Design a protein with these regions (language model features):
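Alpha-helical adaptor scaffolds
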Residues: 109-159, 172
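N-terminal alpha-helical interaction modules that lie
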Residues: 1-97, 101-120, 157-174, 194-225
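Generic helix N-cap/helix-start motif at coil->alpha-helix transitions
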Residues: 10-13, 80, 140-147, 180
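Short alpha-helical linear motifs
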Residues: 57-62, 125-129, 188-191
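Long amphipathic alpha-helical scaffold regions
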Residues: 177-195
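Alpha-solenoid helical repeat scaffolds
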Residues: 52, 119, 125-126, 181-183
Length: 225
């Protein structure tokens, strides 16, 4: 077996583990689900599930990408995001909303890092999407840094209304932050250079872009930015 075949096998195993865990959750076999997850984490990253959940996300990404070709590192990170989503699903099914949210957030960070590095990436069927993880976390206060990455992702993906929503969510979380105001002005400047058709496709027509920028300028004046 070549090294590339080994990597592909690891990725396939992560997808198979997720599919099995979905069935186990449906059957409420949570202990077995945790055992399957623990084995899958060990195979992928050499850590127990508990250790993965305790580690810093950037450290996990660095561990998976170290000394790997970009494609191999990317695929291993997608596998990790898939397993983290499964851990979150398991915790949610058991009513542990705190652990579920923490785990979904970690999965989201891993996935955002992956897709922002490779904008043209087509996700495998088993992998979570940014949108699905964002939806799981809608009731939770995300860090501004996470919202910044979500803004970049939604703009990159052409979901301009969602990018604008992230901007105002960031300002709500950090009122008067002039750096965020500056990032918002840069966002609107980029949007103004797009065609009317592109803006409409992104659910943010030009008049709403202009209105949003006017609102941001007013906000900036109120907060001394």
């Amino acid at each position: 077996m070549t090294y590339q075949d080994y990597i592909l096998r690891q990725i396939q195993q992560a997808g198979q583990a997720w599919a099995r865990i979905v069935r186990l959750i449906k059957d409420r076999q949570f202990e077995t689900a945790r055992m399957v997850l623990d084995q899958a984490y060990r195979q992928l990253i050499g850590l127990t599930s508990g250790a993965v959940l305790e580690r810093d996300t950037n450290g996990l990404i660095a561990r998976l990408r170290f000394d790997e070709a970009p494609a191999a590192g990317r695929d291993k990170c997608l596998a990790l995001a898939t397993l983290l989503r499964a851990s979150g699903d398991t915790a949610a099914a058991q009513g542990d909303s705190v652990t579920a949210a923490d785990t979904y957030h970690k999965a989201l960070l891993v996935l955002l890092d992956t897709v922002l590095r490779d904008p043209s990436l087509a996700l495998p069927d088993y992998a979570p999407t940014v949108e699905s993880l964002d939806a799981e976390l809608w009731a939770h206060a995300l860090p501004v840094t996470t919202r910044q990455e979500l803004l970049l992702y939604y703009e990159q993906a052409g979901f301009y209304a969602k990018a604008e929503d992230m901007l105002w969510a960031m300002l709500q979380a950090a009122p008067g932050d002039c750096a965020i105001v500056g990032a918002g002005r840069a966002l609107y400047a980029r949007l103004q250079h797009l065609s009317d058709a592109a803006l409409i496709a992104g659910n943010l027509p030009r008049d709403e872009v202009d209105g949003g920028l006017a609102d941001l300028d007013a906000y900036a004046g109120e907060h001394g930015c």
